[in-house]
């Protein structure tokens, strides 16, 4: 029984020693510089910013006021038509539910 206790004690001490060394190495790695994840995030944010700026420039170069007015006019006429037909449909449903001829 004494040898088993000694063996368990040595094993526990070995595990604790490895854990302490691993903790010191982790602290040294953190102190050396930014992590790989933060470097990747910075890189992706840079790419996203440049793509966003390029898209904004392209939009500003191709912006046509006449086309914008046509789109706004088409939108207003289509929404007016949808409003009319929605009103008709609502009246029909209400008349069916109330039983009015």
Curated annotation (Swiss-Prot):
Signal peptide positions (record): 1-22
GO CC aspect terms: chylomicron; intermediate-density lipoprotein particle; low-density lipoprotein particle; spherical high-density lipoprotein particle; very-low-density lipoprotein particle
Name by which UniProt lists this protein: Apolipoprotein C-II
Gene: APOC2
Keyword Secreted: yes
PTM remark: Proapolipoprotein C-II is synthesized as a sialic acid containing glycoprotein which is subsequently desialylated prior to its proteolytic processing.
Record's keyword annotation contains Transport: yes
Chain residue ranges for the region called Lipoprotein lipase cofactor: 78-101
Protein species of origin: Panthera tigris altaica
GO biological process: cholesterol efflux; chylomicron remnant clearance; chylomicron remodeling; high-density lipoprotein particle clearance; lipid catabolic process; negative regulation of cholesterol transport; negative regulation of lipid metabolic process; negative regulation of receptor-mediated endocytosis
Region (Lipid binding) location: 66-74
Propeptide: 23-28
